[in-house]
Amino acid sequence: MVNSNMLKKKIDDSGMKIKYVAVQIGLTPAGFYKKINNESEFKVSEVVAITRVLGLSSNERDEIFFGSGVA
């Protein structure tokens, strides 16, 4: 499961919109929202793309996508 709150905060902090990030990683906004809300899982390639687009560190990436305290 994804730490949705942390991912949304990182997107907001970046100054980008969720719809923009969705397009940058090759998803529709609706598909991206489903994944953010844990209705569907992110593919590894999508995690890599989000990490690149948002400029996440490996620790941030791991906390968002692989941490035990996901929300």
Give each language-model segment a name.
Residues 1, 40-44:
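Short acidic alpha-helix initiation/capping motifs at coil-to-helix transition points
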Residues 1-17:
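A short, Lys/Arg-rich alpha-helix, primarily the initiator
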Residues 8, 19, 30, 48:
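Residues within the helices of the helix-turn-helix
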Residues 10, 14-15, 23, 34, ...:
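Short, charged recognition helix plus adjacent turn
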Residues 17, 43-46:
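Residues that mark the N-terminal boundary/hinge immediately upstream of a DNA-recognition element
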Residues 27-41:
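Recognition helix of helix-turn-helix/homeodomain-like DNA-binding domains
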Residues 45-60:
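DNA major-groove recognition helix of helix-turn-helix/homeodomain DNA-binding modules
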